Amino acid sequence: MPNWGGGKKCGVCQKTVYFAEEVQCEGNSFHKSCFLCMVCKKNLDSTTVAVHGEEIYCKSCYGKKYGPKGYGYGQGAGTLSTDKGESLGIKHEEAPGHRPTTNPNASKFAQKIGGSERCPRCSQAVYAAEKVIGAGKSWHKSCFRCAKCGKGLESTTLADKDGEIYCKGCYAKNFGPKGFGFGQGAGALVHSE
């Protein structure tokens, strides 16, 4: 069919795409309303689109349809592994830990000085403008970091042990289960003799 209007054709509906409604992706033009995942129909943008030939997908559906398959894939980011790569010649360096909590008396009364609480990491007064609450204590925003790797934390992404706070990854590495069979997920094969 001839293109009399001079506009580009949408990669999904094949109708003319005018400039005001155009989204471009890998040399193709789409209507904004047609720039959807072919499977789940979610709206896409330049950061969420994955292209396969002439088809467009969200990254999640693309991975399910065209990603690697088989044993060891699809376990997700939440699995634990104790392999540090020594068999491949990778040398593991421990990150320097942050200074542990120095406050031996963690009672609420002892932490209150002049109407403000003390930060368990630096023992300085914590005022409302810089206060973050985690593990039942008040911290400075700048002190609210993993005691091992220094990663900034949120009250929902921390784990605490012995008065110190850790990111979930460091907590799992240092205090989680260890040994063969842990962290493989529900569908893992179990080696038994």
From Swiss-Prot:
Single GO term (MF): metal ion binding
UniProt xrefs under CDD domains: LIM1_CRP1, LIM2_CRP
Cell cycle keyword on record: no
SMART domains per UniProt: LIM
Subcellular compartments: Nucleus
Superkingdom, taxonomy of origin: Eukaryota
Residues joined by cross-link Glycyl lysine isopeptide (Lys-Gly) (interchain with G-Cter in SUMO2): K91
GO cellular component: actin cytoskeleton; nucleoplasm
Protein name (record): Cysteine and glycine-rich protein 1
Organism the protein comes from: Mus musculus
Lineage: Eukaryota, Metazoa, Chordata, Craniata, Vertebrata
